[in-house]
């Protein structure tokens, strides 16, 4: 989760306010296939802001859609790249004619999706996420309630994104070591 927030903060000053003018999907899929209408929805849309929910980057677009990016384990966003590397899978150009962004993912564990922002609460990747650990929604009582009835080892339970959203293996291991 902290890594995704760092990426969000890094992309925001470069991409917020930019209009997507070109998209080059250099393969039909990452972890999952790209939506059929991915390029058509993106081209001409302005990135109004970039949010984060759990491990997902949410690019809020002017056309009423949200473009979602999950980095997986090895996904990287680079602004200003020509995108000619072997693992540069998605290349974007923006309205100033000079700005570019590239999504690179050596292992292709990341993925992208696009959906109508008004339907976000029903979106399959986001609808069942639990509270994030650094928000006011996360309390000892909420954690207790979300763990109630779990029969798995505590590490597996904490990695379940329905219980606590945004925790990965490294953070859960550190939490359990310190507890």
Where are these regions (language model features)?
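Structured catalytic/nucleic-acid-binding cores of DNA maintenance enzymes
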Residues: 1-179
């Amino acid at each position: 989760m902290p890594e995704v927030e760092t990426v969000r903060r890094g992309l925001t000053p470069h991409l917020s306010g930019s209009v997507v003018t070109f998209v080059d999907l250099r393969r039909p899929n990452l972890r999952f296939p790209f939506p059929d209408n991915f390029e058509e929805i993106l081209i001409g849309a302005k990135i109004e802001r970039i949010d984060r929910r759990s491990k997902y980057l949410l690019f809020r677009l002017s056309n009423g859609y949200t473009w979602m990016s999950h980095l997986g384990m090895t996904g990287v966003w680079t602004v200003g790249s020509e995108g000619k590397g072997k693992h540069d899978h998605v290349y974007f150009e923006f309205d100033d004619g000079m700005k570019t962004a590239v999504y690179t993912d050596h292992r292709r564990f990341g993925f992208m999706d696009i959906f109508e922002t008004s339907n976000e609460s029903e979106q399959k990747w986001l609808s069942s996420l639990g509270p994030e650990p650094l928000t006011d929604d996360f309390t000892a009582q909420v954690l207790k309630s979300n763990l109630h009835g779990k029969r798995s080892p505590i590490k597996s339970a904490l990695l379940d994104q329905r219980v606590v959203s945004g925790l990965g293996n490294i953070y859960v291991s550190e939490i359990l070591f310190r507890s």
